[in-house]
Amino acid sequence: MKVRASVKKICRNCKIIRRKNIIRVICSNDPKHKQRQG
């Protein structure tokens, strides 16, 4: 899980999801692409 100021999709399988005002990126293809804004 990377914590970044700006989250972006890294590959085409990445999905941007908003949970409790936290923006996250979830990737089914590569777990290294998981990110959270903070």
From Swiss-Prot:
GO molecular function terms listed in the Swiss-Prot or TrEMBL record:
structural constituent of ribosome
Report if keyword Acetylation is assigned: no
Q: Which GO terms describe its biological process?
A: translation
PROSITE patterns recorded: RIBOSOMAL_L36
Top-level lineage group: Bacteria
Record's keyword terms, sorted: Ribonucleoprotein, Ribosomal protein
An example Gene Ontology CC term for this record: ribosome
Q: Which HAMAP family match?
A: Ribosomal_bL36
Q: What family name appears in the similarity comment?
A: Belongs to the bacterial ribosomal protein bL36 family.
Q: What is this protein called?
A: Large ribosomal subunit protein bL36
**Whose protein is this, by species?**
Buchnera aphidicola subsp. Cinara cedri (strain Cc)
At the highest ranks, the source species' classification is: Bacteria, Pseudomonadati, Pseudomonadota, Gammaproteobacteria, Enterobacterales
